[in-house]
Amino acid sequence: DKDNLINRTLFGDGVFAGERVAYDDFVLEGGSIESDGRGTVLTTSVCLMAPNRNQPLSQAEVEKVLKERLCARKIVWFDHGQLIGDDTDGHIDTIVRLCPDNTLLYVGCDDENDPQYADLHALEQQLKAATDADGKPYRLLRLPMPDALYDDGDRLPATYANFLIING
């Protein structure tokens, strides 16, 4: 609710141009998608299809909403990469980030003993097969997985991918 409040306040103050459109029937937090601004949106199925978000919509219906409301031509769904301790149900911005020149930064794991190793390896395979809305493959840059961090014995979903990008 506070996320929406800041948007309404900024719009009311004239910071955003155009008409305010409210979509109260669809849950889409900021970190749940990445967009290149050229028609491609990245997301994870575990996040947008979580029971606490857009049920009872099917994945095809969610994709249709994203394409219509975000003017996207292609939605790239990743089925892997949810981190232990992640309370966002797998926001894309903790594991994969879009960068200029059709580049994706992504979290990799080299420790075969890490419980996240297999899932992050499967994510890497999906990334290698992914293309943008124009059918171009991505240039991939792998970020290391930081050493495990714990809070009261619970693993935290720490990565180097979850950062703020400011353009301009």
Regions found by a protein language model. Name each.
Residues 1-168:
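The feature marks the mature, well-folded catalytic cores of soluble enzymes
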